[in-house]
Amino acid sequence: IEEYLEYITYYIKDGKEYTNNERGKKRKLSALKSFYNYFFCMEIISSNPAALVPLPKLHEKEIVRLDVDEVAILLDQVEDGTKLTKSQLKYHNKTKIRDVALLTLLLGTGIRVSECVGLDINDVDFKNNGIKIRRKGGYETVIYFSEEVSEALHDYLEKRHHIIPLEGHENAFFLSIQNRRITVRAVENLVKKYASTVTSLKKITPHKLRSTYGTTLYQETGDIYLVA
């Protein structure tokens, strides 16, 4: 059994390479243990060697997120751009209001980047401070936001009204510098650009901003179900 576990760590079958991490090996060993246990209980075999093999321990990955001070520094960096390169600064004045709104929205609501880029102008309700988003699976839901998020979105929308979008992108809330609906990749690069000026020890992605939001929400409410 131990040789089997060593084998499935990396093997080639029908010309294809296969690997299994700790989680994959634990899943396969659990199935093997159940198989042996059944035959042992049915007295088909006289011993159960699988019972002597411990399940692999899963090493939990550290959750990477920004702390409160880093969030403040991140948003300050988006506004002033003091640590950006010369080439990045060329576009900074054109995009900083949009970038502040986008990052404030991600940090303030915990929505996915795909949900963020999919926002249309009519999806934002400033009267009730809510946005209508489309979740995985196609269903719609309303997420509410704070006054801070509302102010950032208002500032961007005021500028957005003076931009003429390309045909087919008229309804998009967030636009790229090419006046198209901004893409997931563009937001990922945007987050990476600003986050690198705040911390070089953490690899911050839009998903990590969701972790930051979730952690903050849990610390404020103590309700894990709200975070989920």
Task: Identify the residue ranges that each predicted region occupies.
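Conserved catalytic core of the tyrosine transesterase superfamily
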Residues: 1-228
